[in-house]
Amino acid sequence: MNQEIMNLFNPTTPAQVFDQIRISIASPEKILSWSYGEIKKPETINYRTFKPERDGLFCARIFGPIKDYECLCGKYKRMKYKGIICEKCSVEVTLSRVRRERMGHIELAAPVAHIWFLKSLPSRIGLLLDMTLKDLERILYFEYYVVLEPGLTALKDRQLLSEDEYLKAQDEYGQDSFTAMIGAEAIRELLRGLELEKLEQTLRAEMQETDSDIKHKKLAKRLKIVEAFRHSGNKPEWMIMTVVPVIPPDLRPLVPLDGGRFATSDLNDLYRRVINRNNRLKRLMELRAPDIIIRNEKRMLQEAVDALFDNGRRGRVITGANKRPLKSLADMLKGKQGRFRQNLLGKRVDYSGRSVIVVGPELRLHQCGLPKKMALELFKPFIYSRLDAKGLSTTVKQAKKLVEKERPEVWDILDEVIREHPVLLNRAPTLHRLGIQAFEPVLIEGKAIQLHPLVCSAFNADFDGDQMAVHVPLSLEAQLEARVLMMSTNNILHPANGQPIIVPSQDIVLGLYYLSIMREGMNGQGMTFGNMAELEHALHAKAIHLHSKIKYRWEGMDETGKISKRWIETTAGRVMLGNVLPRHPRISYEIINKLMTKREISGVIDQVYRHCGQKETVIFCDRIMALGFYNAFKAGISFGKDDMVVPAGKWKIVDTTRTLAKDFEQQYNDGLITHGEKYNKVVDAWSKASEEIAKEMMKEISVTKKTATGADADINSIYMMSHSGARGSPAQMRQLAGMRGLMAKPSGEIIETPIISNFKEGLSVLEYFNSTHGARKGLADTALKTANSGYLTRRLVDVAQDCIITQDDCGTHLGIKMRAIVDAGTVVASLGSRILGRVPCDDVRDPATNAVLVKAGTLMEESHIDAIQQAGVQEVKIRSALTCELVNGICKMCYGRDLARGTPVNHGEAVGVIAAQSIGEPGTQLTMRTFHIGGAAQLNEQSFVESNFEGRVVIKNKAIARNSEGHLIAMVRNMVVTIVDPDGSERATHRIQYGARMHVDDGDMIKRGQRIAEWDPYTRPILTEAEGTIGFEDLTEGLSISETLDESTGIAKRVVIDWRGTRGGADLRPAIVIKGKDGKVLKLARGGDARYMLSVDAILSVDVGTTVKPGDILARISTESAKTRDITGGLPRVAELFEARKPKDAAIIAEIAGTIRFGRDYKNKRRISIEPVDKTEEPREYLIPKGKHIHLQDGDIVEKGDFIVEGNPAPHDILAIKGIEELAAYLVNEIQEVYRLQGVLINDKHIEVIVRQMLQKIEVTDQGDTDMIAGEQVDKIEFDALNAKAVEEGKKPATGNPVLLGITKASLQTRSFFSAASFQETTRVLTEAAVNGKIDPLEGLKENVIVGRLIPAGTGASMARIREVALKRDKLILDEREKQAAIVPSQPEPQPLALPPAE
């Protein structure tokens, strides 16, 4: 009996265990098999009794009872009648929960087309039938007939006939001589008549024959969909529906409101319309109504069903009573409020609370202060169970009363319950995983949560009113995970870059900085102390000052780990700091025996973590926090107006710059420079002045002054705050005490007149007005930035969510080469910082001795990096996520170190999500601006390069000429200057601009800081390579050249104008030629004439008949008029790169190495071809718009990958021309550059993981003997699998090239349709998936969250691995049984097997 009662509580339907989910088109039989009955009436519930009407939309007979175990009429009540069907009201006695599961159906009187397959582009029905959407709609909505069987008439198959034509044809050929139909029936017949196998063969044959690219594409599309239907087992006619399923009533509820009205789901209205029209159609058909009426009714039925499935997809949107569009089934899934994102991926939790946060400086790092009131509420169930266990209450009700009265014993129990039970704290927005961390609660009075100051930077929290949420992990497993993985003490390093994130900030930093100052001449200087007690005594007695220079006997550890003592020169403050430092052989006193700025402290924490481990680090952090707070309070550092020092030389600098600006104005008036150049120069001059004033100010403020006694005076407070890294930056100090500087207009341009005053002196009205411009734009930007940054993160997470560490080693030998990143001669990212925590592919050897420094396959630690840098290794080839050969996921070796732990990465780590968060989280710190060139203030134009090393100069691709002024001029674009040190290893390489003046020559010795070359950053020259006299070609006044008078100055200059639009100007090719003594055009050494083509806006620098020498300037293009592209910076640039968009004015890249040849012009484009060096290759041709400046001449030699036209290269071109490694290097460097500008550190591997996900597809170039279609994009995994199958069968495999997809596209094309559908374009993804009968293997994180299983990462990964092993064993056993059965057919029962041992 007991067993039976227990069974009653079991779910009515058994829970399904599944590994994959398949989606396909439902056949009418399938829909009927789901249904529990047909819905015949549009009624919902009776208005008097509130009981559902029979056969209506809420019918209890079909969908089940309203109350648990009670039929509708009330004849059978209670459990004992379970499963009986009442003979009076025909309702089954069961749980009312079945009303959430049971479906119904509507039998349609006429078939209708499913709108998704009709209207979702490309139209699937249209593709299959090879008809246009317009024609299909004409048939479906009863405008035209379609001929199905022309018979012996002159009509064609599938010809459309209007009403009149149809009647005429019937008269002409007789009624039964041909068949033509109209409406969905016609389409259904057409679809039913398709013979897919035959169709596939015809299409393949047609594809072989056709030459037209467009036709080939169209056929490929059709072939793909025909294959999809063949392989998936879907039948084409199922896209036309004869039965409509009705979803369970509890999923479209009707709720009575007070006042006798009802709130209902929109679906009920939509279903009602379908039923009404369907019933009306049935009646009309029974009555044999005229054709036209029936047809109209059928059309209305089609529209009603369309609206039910996807309202507004076709025709006008159907609105409810309040003019609001009704929410159809498709809308239920779509968008942020849809089922996927709202309910499946955005579930809410039950046990949580939220409150304002306040600072808790006396907490330990792993603690948080939880208000008692809050804890009592959150831990209620635990308290009830403890009260019960202790016998203080017998029922829940009693326990509830005790808790409500807040009896003393309740508080004691709360203390017990809370002990060692971590809670999760979360601050929105949770931009990365450190936004949720676990703490042990400490009960406090009051109503605010106390937060430890050191975790603020991880949460990005401050105490100006921020709120935080508290969540309680309930199950034991959850508590365990919270403690082991999420405890704040486990999150010391930042997952994005491996630097400590538990770093003191603000007042702690200030206190530690003050503590570590050393000042000359303070009292007690030179005293000696043996231990801490003596030192403290002297301090309290004021015999010495905290900052006095003293000698101290320090007890450290030597290499062997023994205590060793030595004398050190230090200050009392630094000894106090040294006292909290853990003792370890690798940690010397020297790391804190200096002025402690924020960066230094971060370094110390890093060292302590690396050498002493986590526990010591946590204790150390808590101690320095206490020390910092205490000393900040003792120091009494304040902020006063007189601490801001306006530099004495300010006005002198301002006056000089004003004169300069006047000069530029004058030069412009004299016509020597253009308006744009003047603007550039003025802005440049002012930004330099502003920097100089800032330098002067910093110099004055940072100088230590002496007091009367000769001791060092106190350091300036504001300088201390800024220098320590506690608050404020030199830029802010410049505005306070230097000069406010240049301001930007809302458009992003820079206003020429700077703000000369600073805030201390006060701004004039005009200056104030100018500065409001920029300030307002800043605020508007911030609002936009947050939304954009969040969207970028969402796209990144979506593309990378299924990237998980699944195996130890994929065994690949591939990798990418890493070298230091050098920008304009300075090392921006050293080789060491880039390869730390990665695995080398090959042994790393010392270039001098060839000894192995690091063996291949070793994870490189800090010690290895030191050795590599000492040896001067320039390049290391490392394993990378990009080259990992695992099918799903990445292997440990290719990923390397887990940055947040400093150890090799673990199995099941969700590296994709970590990468996405690391890139997305700093997004809000990036700027939103697109820089317009002109503001040199943002774009410190480089006008020279100087050497950062001593050594010898080596010039590659050397071509230097001495011009008529005697300067050495660089004559080629690919000239590279390398500085080589005495051992012969390269120190630095610099690319030299075309037309630059060289200060050194090949083989010269160079000193540090010496200039190598300089050039004018604002113009691009066109230089001559020959000596001779100038001649003009096609430079006709008024046609291709004009003397423009500058309006404001009245000075003439000669500029090439756009000659293509003028009459008779289309064939002109304006050029400057160099003639010899005989008056003929000179020939150049490299072949070709000395003829220099001019592009629009070139300003001539020479006249006919002038004599020139090699290296002289013939014309110049002002970069402002060469319209150097807008520089997209910040967030938009990162998004552009990840979306792999083609940039505006993209560069044109040479696909092969060879010689440039100018061909005949084509309309208004220049034709350039490359004659390949390798004669087996075809020459390549490029058409370039005439106005674009091509800086190559006829006969120039280009390498593969060189730019023919300058600009940003399109990433697809880089991939096609130079391959994956170059593309990865380009994307990583470009993205890093944006983040570096903002001072954000992100490890390269995160970007590599995302780029790996962008390269998952392959475009088939030749299909071989496989089923793939040339030109289609296939998943890498699928491609390899199909090829392997082909090779196995002895067929020819397909070939293909990798394709780069932007992150949005890549997310929509993942193998999991669940993941794609919940991202964007839900309808399209689901339609596509259903047609293909796709199977979702549920491998990623997102799909598993949607179906409500453990995600296959972290703890879920180990579960998945255990299941894998179990499945393998099951298979072995079954195989073994089959074998035994085959051997001994007579044996009745197979013997039990000895199981193979578990792995």
Curated annotation (Swiss-Prot):
Catalysed reaction, written as an equation: RNA(n) + a ribonucleoside 5'-triphosphate = RNA(n+1) + diphosphate
Record-linked HAMAP family: RNApol_bact_RpoC
Stored SMART domains: RPOLA_N (SM00663)
Record region (Disordered): 1379-1399
KW 4Fe-4S (keyword) present: no
Keyword terms, alphabetized: DNA-directed RNA polymerase, Magnesium, Metal-binding, Nucleotidyltransferase, Transcription, Transferase, Zinc
Full protein name: DNA-directed RNA polymerase subunit beta'
Biological role stated in the UniProt entry: DNA-dependent RNA polymerase catalyzes the transcription of DNA into RNA using the four ribonucleoside triphosphates as substrates.
Positions bound to Mg(2+): 462, 464, 466
GO biological process: DNA-templated transcription
Binding positions (Zn(2+) 1): 71, 73, 86, 89
Stored InterPro entries: DNA-dir_RpoC_beta_prime, DNA-dir_RpoC_beta_prime_bact, RNA_pol_asu, RNA_pol_N, RNA_pol_Rpb1_1, RNA_pol_Rpb1_3, RNA_pol_Rpb1_3_sf, RNA_pol_Rpb1_4
Family: Belongs to the RNA polymerase beta' chain family.
GO molecular function, one term: DNA-directed RNA polymerase activity
